[in-house]
Amino acid sequence: MTILNHNPVYGATQKTATTKVSSATAIANTDLDDTPTGTALLLTAPAGGCAVTRLTGQLVEPNLATACQLNLYLSKDSGTTMRRLKSVAHAAYTWAVTTAPATDDFGYTESAPLRLEASDRLYAQVRAGTAVTDAFAFTAEYAELVPDA
């Protein structure tokens, strides 16, 4: 049986959300789910939900030169419980005027977006061996979803 979508949903408004995240010293492997520490709120989905089409993290603090892990969490209860959605590795980088730090892409695209329901929240976290304040900037590009009237 074929199920037809009689109420298509379209992206109405393109938006961007951003946050800076500090790296916490030695976040334990057991601190990766449910109630992780050192997270920062990146995005709260609007009333109609949204489709995240790009999500990146970029090193912005020159005092963090070690490799680290960038984590993305989803919360459906206003941040009480967070589930890790995805992690990307950030390679070690030494600041120099002739090079730029890499932008780490979480892999969401317009053809393969991360769909969020109304009020879902995305949180970002950096796991590194060195504590650095505001070490990474996370950016989410998304489209607010509105049902076709």
Go through the PLM ranges and name each one.
Residues 1-40, 44-47, 117-121, 126-149:
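C-terminal interaction-tip segments
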Residues 19, 24, 58, 87-88:
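General helical structural elements
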Residues 35-76, 83-86, 133-147:
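Beta-rich globular "head" domains
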Residues 54, 83-86, 115, 121, ...:
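Arginine residue identity/basic-tract feature
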Residues 62, 112-116, 131:
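Short, charge-rich binding segments
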Residues 67-112:
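Terminal beta-strand-rich extracellular "head" domains
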